[in-house]
Every structure is written in structure tokens, then in C-alpha cells.
A protein has these predicted regions:
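A charged, aromatic-enriched C-terminal amphipathic alpha-helix characteristic of glycosyltransferases
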Residues: 354-384
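Aromatic "clamp/platform" in nucleotide-sugar-dependent glycosyltransferases that forms part
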Residues: 297
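Short alpha-helical donor nucleotide-sugar binding micro-motif in glycosyltransferases
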Residues: 278-279, 284-289
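Conserved catalytic-core segment of nucleotide-activated headgroup transferases in glycan assembly
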Residues: 213-269, 275
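Conserved acidic donor-binding segment of nucleotide-sugar-dependent glycosyltransferases
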Residues: 231, 331-339, 348-353
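Short His-centered aromatic/hydrophobic patch
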Residues: 144-149, 167
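Donor nucleotide-sugar binding/catalytic pocket of nucleotide-sugar-dependent glycosyltransferases
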Residues: 184-217, 234
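Short hydrophobic beta-strand element within catalytic cores of glycosyltransferases
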Residues: 314-317
Length: 392
């Protein structure tokens, strides 16, 4: 059977049209289920689903310790440092007997690792539906992270609950914490330098992000790459090809991040630079990495630095205060804009065996220090004391 060109073109057009309809319909269905997200846009949320949010939460049991944690975004759809840290802290606190509910603007899944997640509408927390309001009323503590501080307090002051603000970045509107905000206020800083920059008008604690380093403690066989993880502008994505061009004999690896625009133009990169897509398992990447670089403009800690140091990988960092606090005695740093410094330090580590050995030893010693810290235990004690102090 011979099909004419016109008929073939018509069939192809109908096939494409059907495919587009199916994809659009699928997006709509996934959106209504709360599991569709495109890029960095906030997922669509139907009024029907929002009205039912948290209505299924059971009444608080006698003796139950309950936290309602408000965030802009959460895992699994955003795998940035503060979201991963919150996931780790929540998992630890659950083991300590806390019940925790998460509220997010960017709602994608209704549950993650045993934690129920409910949607809130951006900028309209004060107009939350009945289920969310009852959840606030039942809480021992309301926590906030990466959420506008003033908006948070305006929305929850009526419930007279203690509010714990988790500060992870220098960009949070911290000036709001210089004043009395109505509800009893407490602050959890993720690094010392952010606390030192603030007014410390409220009781607070510093809790560094905790990384389970055991799976990253391994011996390497002939690692060859200088690696940058997350190629956005803030992390150093524009600087990476410049360094690679200056060191043509050394192999560089850029791992695409899971958020923000990635600077990974293949046509502009030197031949000794390889880009890879976002990775879910970083063990293989670290096994192939001889030196990790972190030329970040702003970084309050450095989860990837900790993961890399666990295997003795030297890490060259910018002079961002959070990174310097993170690497501690293993510091190997450059001003972010000083290209010659990055080139010099990388070349020395990649070609001088003694320099590499000494830096590797310091990385492992720093991990021993971090592994000894019991900061999540202190967080549990801090929160338990707050709940007891304000119990009715």
C-alpha cells in the first residue's frame, strides 16, 4: 500500500497534535495531583486541593510534640543545601519523638519519607484554609525557613505559638529579627558568622548542617578531575572554563546543579572540560575527583566540601565566610575573582605529591572534627525546652 505525500504529512500532523494533547492533559492531571513542576516555576495548585489541605491531620495526642515547619520549598523537588539539611534535621527529630508537618509554596508531593507535606499559597499564608489553621493551633512550635520573616509572623501571631526561625543564608530578611515580632521568637543559625553579623535580639543556637560522611570515606584509584559541583553563576560556573583554559594539561569536570541557570555552553568550553548532568549518587563523582573547587560568591556552609573531604579530597574554596568556617583547618582559599590564585593552587595540588598528601591529611582531620560534633542533639534539647516553656 502506497501512501501519498499529502496523506503522510496529514498523518504526521495528527500524530504530533495527539502527542501534544496527551502531554498537556498529563501535565494538567499531574498538576492537580500536586506533582507537576516545570523548571523553577511554582507548580499549579487547584483551589479544591488547597481547600482540603491538612484536613486529614488527626488531633494532637496527649504528650505528642508537634512542629509545623513552613518553607518556600522542600525535597524531593529542590535538592539545595538548606532543603537537604531540613530533611536531615526532620529525620533526626522524628527519631527523638517529634511529629513534624511541612508546609511549602512549591508543593510537589504530599509525603516524603514519612513526613506529610501540605501546600500554602505564596504571599497568602494569612488566608490559609481551615485545615492549615487547625494545624497551626495544634503546634507546639511553628518553624520557618527560607520564608519571608515578616509575612510569617503576620500570619501566625494570632495563634500565640513560639516561632523558631531557621536562618540558612545571608539573603534572608534578617533585619526583621532586630525587633519584637509578637510571637515568642527563637533563631537557629546554620553557621556562626551569620549569628555574629546579626543583632541577636532573640534566644538562639548555632547548628551546623550535619552530613553522614561514612559513605564518602573510601580509597581512590587514580582520580583525575578537578571538579565543580553546580555550574550556576554563584557557585563559579563562569569561572570554571577560565581556569580550565589556563591549565590545558589538567582534566576538569562540571556537574550541573538542580537549580538556577547553569553556565554549561559546550561551544565555549575548552577540550579539557567535561560537563555532566545532575547526579543523584555523588560517590562515583568523588571517586573520580582529585581536587574539588568551590569558587562561590555566597555560601553559608558547604555540604559538598564535607562530602569531598571525607575521602581526603583537598578542597579549594573562595573566601566566603561560610566556606572558611566549614573547611576549618583544611583551608585552601582564594579570592573569588583572583584567577591566578585558583590556577596556582590547583596546579600545585595536581602536580606536587607532597602538597597533595598534606592537604589530604588536613581534609580527613577536619572530617574527624565535624563527625565528633553532636549538634542535632543540641537542636532537640533547644526545641524541647522551647515547647516546655510555652506549653499551656
Amino acid at each position: 500500500m502506497v501512501i501519498s505525500t499529502e496523506v503522510g504529512a496529514l498523518l504526521l500532523f495528527l500524530l504530533v497534535l495527539t502527542s501534544l494533547y496527551f502531554i498537556t492533559n498529563l501535565k494538567q492531571r499531574l498538576s492537580k495531583a500536586g506533582i507537576w513542576s516545570h523548571g523553577n516555576e511554582d507548580p499549579e495548585l487547584s483551589d479544591e486541593i488547597y481547600a482540603k489541605a491538612a484536613l486529614s491531620v488527626p488531633p494532637k495526642r496527649p504528650g505528642e510534640k508537634r512542629i509545623v515547619w513552613i518553607m518556600h520549598s522542600y525535597v524531593p523537588n529542590v535538592l539545595a543545601g538548606s532543603e537537604i539539611t531540613a530533611e536531615d534535621q526532620i529525620a533526626f527529630l522524628k527519631k527523638k519523638g517529634w511529629t513534624i508537618y511541612v508546609l511549602v509554596n512549591r508543593w510537589v508531593v504530599p509525603e516524603h519519607k514519612g513526613v506529610q507535606i501540605f501546600p500554602i499559597q505564596k504571599g497568602r499564608l494569612g488566608e490559609a484554609p481551615d485545615g492549615i489553621r487547625k494545624l497551626f493551633q495544634s503546634a507546639d512550635i511553628i518553624a520557618g525557613q527560607n520564608y519571608p520573616i515578616t509575612d510569617l509572623f503576620l500570619a501566625v501571631n494570632e495563634f500565640s505559638k513560639p516561632v523558631v526561625v531557621f536562618l540558612h543564608t545571608q539573603n534572608d530578611n534578617r533585619e526583621s529579627l532586630s525587633f519584637r515580632l509578637g510571637s515568642p521568637t527563637y533563631v537557629v543559625y546554620n553557621v556562626n558568622f551569620i549569628k555574629l553579623e546579626g543583632t541577636n535580639a532573640h534566644p538562639s543556637i548555632v547548628v551546623h548542617p550535619k552530613v553522614n560522611t561514612e559513605k564518602f570515606k573510601f580509597d581512590k584509584e587514580n582520580p583525575k578531575y578537578v571538579t565543580l559541583i553546580n555550574c550556576n553563576e554563584n557557585k563559579g560556573g563562569l569561572l570554571l572554563p577560565q581556569i580550565a583554559k589556563a591549565l590545558p594539561e589538567i582534566q576538569f569536570l562540571g556537574i550541573k546543579g538542580g537549580y538556577a541557570k547553569q553556565n554549561v555552553k559546550d561551544e565555549d568550553k575548552p577540550v579539557n572540560l567535561t560537563y555532566m548532568d545532575t547526579q543523584t549518587d555523588m560517590v562515583k563523582i568523588y571517586k573520580d575527583t582529585k581536587v574539588l573547587i568551590m569558587p562561590s560568591k555566597s555560601e553559608t556552609w558547604g555540604r559538598t566540601a564535607v562530602e569531598a573531604m571525607a575521602s581526603g579530597t583537598p578542597v579549594v574554596v573562595s573566601k566566603s565566610p561560610g566556606l572558611l568556617e566549614c573547611v576549618g583547618k583544611a583551608e585552601n582559599s582564594c579570592d573569588r575573582s583572583d584567577l591566578s590564585c585558583w590556577v596556582e593552587k590547583i596546579e600545585k595540588l595536581m602536580t606536587d605529591d607532597k602538597a597533595y598528601h598534606d592537604a589530604s591529611v588536613l581534609s580527613k582531620e577536619r572530617i574527624m572534627e565535624l563527625d565528633r560534633e553532636d549538634e542535632y542533639e543540641r537542636l532537640d534539647i533547644f526545641l524541647t525546652d522551647i515547647a516546655k516553656r510555652h506549653s499551656v
